[in-house]
Amino acid sequence: AELMRERMLALGFDEVVFDRLGNVIGTIHGKRPGKTILLDGHMDTVDVIDAAEWSHDPFGGEISDGKIYGRGASDMKGSDCAMVMATGRFAARTKKDFAGTICVSGSVHEECFEGVAPREITKRIHPDFVIVGEATSTSVKIGQRGRAEVVVETKGVSCHSSNPEKGVNAVYAMVGVIEEIRKIVPNEHPLLGKGILELTDIISAPYPGASVVPAKCRATFDRRTLVGEDEA
């Protein structure tokens, strides 16, 4: 965020601020009144699980065959850089003689709390148009599926694993639940494509369960919703 702020200021952005969540927001005002466009990209990335399995240093930003390799190069620091640079260059080339306002935001926590940071950004600015720079293989995507996190829990009876017949294994119960959930076929939308219902993590308790039959199991599903769907 600090690096983006420094680059924005160097490129002549009129103002650059941090909000209470840590989002960085840069603004360039045109000389004539007009609409506001927001270019947004998140700055966070998913974790690197095993750096030794990478062909390049995940934090090295190495350039090979004209490509930058590193965690987040595509998702989505490359777009963040492109939007900052393009906005700064456009303002310089036009000498800010354009109608409206251009805002560029670097948002936080997209990978784990998608949607929270942009809501905070739009409390400060009220864009007429928004472009999210997520990688789309250079094709324009209009709109986005919604998102819900579905958590399912099963309960059993804990006991020592040397006498499993004295308990009820919550994980085995969860297996049956997951099999039934996988039979659900999400709806489709002509513009947004297929809805998604995907298992993303499963954990038992106690964990680690050294010699203990688990009494609880929790599974989390990533549900990408379509227009017209609700909690039901």
Could you tell me what each predicted segment is?
Residues I37-L39, I131, V157:
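Residue-level marker for buried hydrophobic side chains located in beta-strands
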Residues V16, G26, G61-I63, L199-I202:
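A structural signal for short hydrophobic beta-strand segments in well-ordered beta-sheet cores
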Residues G34-C103:
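Active-site metal-coordination/substrate-binding segment of hydrolases
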Residues M76-R145, E149:
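Acidic/histidine-rich catalytic neighborhood of metal-dependent amide-processing enzymes
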Residues A1-I49, K216-T220:
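N-terminal helical capping/dimerization or prosegment-like subdomains
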Residues F18-D19, C112-F113, G133, T200-S204:
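Short gly/ser/thr-rich secondary-structure transition/capping motifs
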Residues A1, I142, V151-A232:
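Metal-dependent amide/peptide-bond hydrolase catalytic core
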Residues I25, D40, A99, C103, ...:
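Beta-strand secondary-structure signal
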